[in-house]
Each structure stands twice: as C-alpha cells, then as structure tokens.
C-alpha cells in the first residue's frame, strides 16, 4: 500500500506521518514522497522505528521518551543502580539496569553494556540525548556493528568536527565567516610569536581537542606568550591526549550565538532558529535563552545561512531513520 504524504517533506514529518498510519493498524505501508518540495531524492521508503533505547538519564531522557511516545514508538530506558528510584526510570515503557560495578556516572559510559541491553531489548535505534556518549565516535561504531541505528551524526563527522583545527578547515571550505587566526597547529614558540604578531594581541591559544571550558588561554601581550604557550601545550597533553595548539583573535565581550539544525540522510538541512549562550562561567554556558535579542536581522540571517552551509559542506546529519 502506498500513501502519499501531503505534509512538509522533511524526514521528521514523513516519519511522524508513517507512524500515524501504522498506529491506525495499517501495516506494510510505504510512504511515497512526490518529487519536489524539500525532498531531493524523489521517492523515500521508510520503515518506522518500533523500539528506541535512550542512552541517557534524568530530564534529558524524559524529553526523548515524550517525543517517542508522541510518535507511537516503544521507549526503552537504562539506569544505574543509584538511579533505580529516579523518576525517569518509570517514564520509559521498559527499563534495564546497567552494570552495578560501574558507578553512578561511568555506568552511562559503558558502551559494551549499553549495546548488550539494546540487543536484549531488540531495539531498532539508540538516541543518545546529549552529554555522556552523544559525541563519542566509538559508540556510533559499536551501534553500526550491532546493526542498530544511531540517531545522530556519523562517526566520521564526529571525528572531523570534534577537532577544532579540522572543523575550522571545513568552515573555510564552506565559505562561512570565521574568527581571524590560523587553521593549523603551531609547533614552536617562534611560530606562535610570529602568528600572534600577525593576528594582533590580545589572542587566544586554543587546544585543537579542547572542550568543557578547558584548553583556552587569553594572551594579552608578547611578553606573556612563551609561558602561556608552554602551559597550554602541557594542559592540552594531560587533559586531551595531544598538544596541538592554534591561535585565534580574542574577541572581548562577544555574543555567543548558537543555531539548532536538523539534517537528514539526503542532504536536507533546516535551522530551528537561534539561542544566546553568552552568559558563561569559565568558558562554559550557564544560561541559554531564545531567541537571541539585540542582533540585526541581517546578521541573524547570515548566521542561519552559514550554519546550513557548513552542515551541507561536511555532510552532517542528526535526523536519521531506518531505510
């Protein structure tokens, strides 16, 4: 049986329509998308997810459960021994306890244990939420090897965009605006001093694999650079496993604006508008609010266009389905 969708032709809307059809007792259906609109492939055949495991906890897991419930998908949860009485456990249709010897945090980082539960529960896909394993390419690879769909970016995209130097190079290829600086690792103090003079102080030293607010140092003058560079390399080596450092111009009092994007398997990318994340402590966001205010609409549109352009350049996807 073939049903033609008259809804918005994006992966998420199509998936929701197919789930609705299935929930009404119509089986073995094919969703056919007419050529045009947002679809670039002409015809898409989708097998809706029936069971999805959420590899997270707390409010994050509850939000994903709710979205899955709205689509008529069975939710499978995981929880540590310490979380056995937590609210989120009862919100899933099925829940499985993680290994007891892992602790309250490491239990949610146990790739092997989570995959074992996913197989036992016979799930079609795993949604990582955010944090924990959501940006771990090894987890994505483990899902692929188990024949389970990972709802998120591919491991190649994670590896490429998780490295700040690599991601900056991709941004340059995409033709999107970037902060003045260099797109390669600096190997010597002499090279660092030369680049800093070229960019102009103040500058920021950044670890290519930095994250969590660490791996960034502001340098206001040439006298401080040798010491700051050595300390930045040592910190990066200890915290992230390598000492690749690059330089960007330091911008005082900037607005930190993020854009939420949705990208499917076929290169369709849409933005879900912006949010302001400028309120920070130690380079980590404290408060986010949307939409961002005090931004000219022309600038806002440039940000949206740049986000979509970059996603298309790298082949990013975060809305996936079982084809």
List where the protein language model places each region:
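N-terminal beta-alpha lobe that positions the nucleotide/phosphoryl donor
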Residues: 26-322
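Accessible peptide chain termini
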Residues: 1-3, 41
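Short hydrophobic alpha-helical segments enriched in small aliphatic residues
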Residues: 4-7, 16, 20
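Cysteine-centric signal of extracytoplasmic or virion-exposed proteins
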Residues: 13, 19, 29-31
